[in-house]
Amino acid sequence: ISAKKCVLAVPASILKNIDVNPEFSKEKIKCINEQVYGHAMKIAMQYRERFWDNTNSIGQRVFTDTPLRRIYHFSIDQPGPRGILLSFTSGEDAIKLGKLSDDKRSEIAKNTCSKIWDEATQYWERGVAKYWNEDPWTKASYSFSGVGQKDFREVLARPEGPVYFAG
């Protein structure tokens, strides 16, 4: 693409594999190539009934020592009996789950929830996982400043000639 000016909203995880001519400054290229990203995954679990709303349930928000880590109900104001529990996990747990197939991720989610809520298995319908680090458009999740990278954010945001960086 050729243009007089450009607003670029591409994560560094993708940008480092795009040929740019003329090249960005050495400082910008270093930051693009070395930007650190975390690992994050969501697993949405659909159930025929919202058993977590029952009076004797342990609740709608559960923090665990399992690979699912944090589980929240995600069916607020949704009509009907069905409901969604959503797990947020990151770091090593997300990396380990990220190496598994979608079916295996769902199986782990189902089994984990059945240990937390006795009735979970009988209402289970399906699970779907999103691991941002395997997404072809991001190849990463959240970025953060690693050791020695305190200036990266400023450098990555700085315009390079007619190219402006967003996101």
Located regions from the model:
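Flavin (primarily FAD) binding-site architecture
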Residues: 2-28, 41-44
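Conserved flavin/dinucleotide-binding core of flavoenzymes
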Residues: 9, 18, 39, 53-167
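Central beta-strand plus flanking loop segment that forms part of the substrate or channel wall
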Residues: 27-56
